[in-house]
């Protein structure tokens, strides 16, 4: 309205007609202004009347009512903030409800005031203001997450080996596991401040701590501090945790102690963290199971508000490097799909096509940047963990070096250093004289105590007592083992080494207790006996674990045997299946082998391919050998040649059979049974002939091979003659030889120089015996020339004689049985005849000399 009035003032002129018109306009404007003012005054009056009426109904003054209404939005904001922070709804109701009640002067005035003041527009405006403030606060809180993580890492020296991005990832993991981001990040920060290390386990630890703290109401810092003690000393830390929270057992502590004593610090820390985490999870579960209906409803309400506020806080929280990479990949994929869809579209102009390409390139560059960021973050996480491990190791060895230095200091050096320290403090006025005197006296007393020689133990255990105690302890140990074996006689029952150690310790303590009743114990024995209960308790725990380990090893061994047996059966079934399909045994065996190899190397495809390739090469070589008939011939001949040239074994066997035959025939002759010297002699001669023929055949084949080789080399004639001579020598042709089979007019055999061959008719006419007598002394080939007399022939046959035995047996037996004298006579005669025959056949031309074949 002011603007028209201003225009009116400016437009006034001295024209009367126009002046009247302008005055009319002024009146209309002022009348409108008056009406507007009256309306405004009426609204204000009505508002004041309503406020006065509401204040009157509430029983308070208008000023008190206005002050209470001004404070109401701020109190609503406090209620929303406290609910989001995880406080109990009942506690918030008591706090904020009491403040609202006090603002209105009581419960009834409060409800009357709220009923009169809360209108729909006011509720909307208030809700909008509260929502805006909450969003602004949430954005600020979420945006400061990384800053808070960095502060925590810096102030803790980053002993956990984490980065802010890694802490953000772990908090997101807790949020995905059902916790809120704030709960997980709070417990994670507390663990980092407590010095908890072990990046692989800190995720599960932080979630367990958050759940336990939420369910029990115990402060997160106290639980995190308990985990921090595990990092310093797993055994003592776990013991302290058991005393404070009662969530781990003595068996778990003993197992951790065993690992730590064996030098496995990392394994001990991991086992301690796992035991503590499991213990807190069990306690959390029991707490929730034992909640009443009201507590359960309150817990669900609180978790609902926490989840709602946590979702609001996500607005300002930064993304992790991995989340940024995922979003960048999605954005690039979307831009690339749009470009591929629009680049060849006829209805898209060049400007739009260029814009689509620019969007794709921007998305690609953003993706590359996100990938580099993710790689850098991964490397930073590794470097942080490595730096943490290095720093922890340095700190550990620094502490050990300091302790070692203190141990290496002599008492005098320690006393001198303490004196200098106290004197300097007194000189600088940093210590009171009375305190100086007390500390100096204590240092002097400690030094003087080190100068006193410790008294030697006056009790000495004799060698006999020690030997007796040792034998007694061994006896008790074996008795305990025997009792256990009698109780557990199953095939799968095994006794662990830890159980045997327990028996040994129990036996030693039993012997010490018995010895204490009959003699005085040494200081060492008293010390052992004083720690009996603790030692045996640890031994029992170790024995129980050792039995479990032994039993599990047995189960594992049986499982491996079962797997091996199953593999064998599958291979057999594969062979059976192959035979059922009509394959040969060799093919079935190959399929079974393939099945065994697949079962054995199935987990490693590369190794399976290698062994299958080598096996197939072997099968190919076997198939090639099976088709090579020449190789079979050579192999058969080589084996037969080895057997034929093994003269020692053959002659040994022949000699054994010969002497056995002589003994059997002699026994048969002496006992009156039927004996067959002819068959025996024939079998002996057959064996000897077979041996000689085998050797001759080997020689012939070898000579023929040499002859063929010589012929190929150009010396066929000479080599052929050499081969024939060698063959003749093998068949003893130097002594006359065999002319071979065939007709009368067919060429056969070989005749030496100076020899001749009898025809078949002449041989029959002269007689074989006479011919042999003619050949005695002439290498069985006969002498070609003027024949000599029979006497000459006999004289030339040296060492040859014929014997005719006339035996007359006078049997002096009774009842038709041969008598002793007759038996002896027959035995002597047979013995003499056998000796003479053997001597004859061993001469030139005899059967044993190679002649007479």
UniProtKB/Swiss-Prot annotation:
Record keywords: Coiled coil, Viral genome ejection through host cell envelope, Viral long flexible tail ejection system, Viral penetration into host cytoplasm, Viral release from host cell, Viral tail assembly, Viral tail protein, Virion, Virus entry into host cell
Low complexity composition-biased segments: 376-387
UniProt PTM: Cleaved into mature protein H* by an unidentified protease.
Transmembrane annotation, as ranges: none
InterPro entries per the UniProt record, alphabetical: GpH_LAMBDA, Phage_tape_meas_C, Phage_tape_measure_N
One Gene Ontology CC term in the entry: virus tail
Localization, UniProt: Virion
Region (Disordered): 370-393
Tree of life domain: Viruses
Family designation: Belongs to the Lambdavirus tape measure protein family.
Subunit structure: Interacts with the tail initiator complex presumably through its C-terminus domain. Interacts with the tail assembly protein G. Interacts with the tail assembly protein GT.
Protein name in UniProt: Tape measure protein
Organism: Escherichia phage lambda
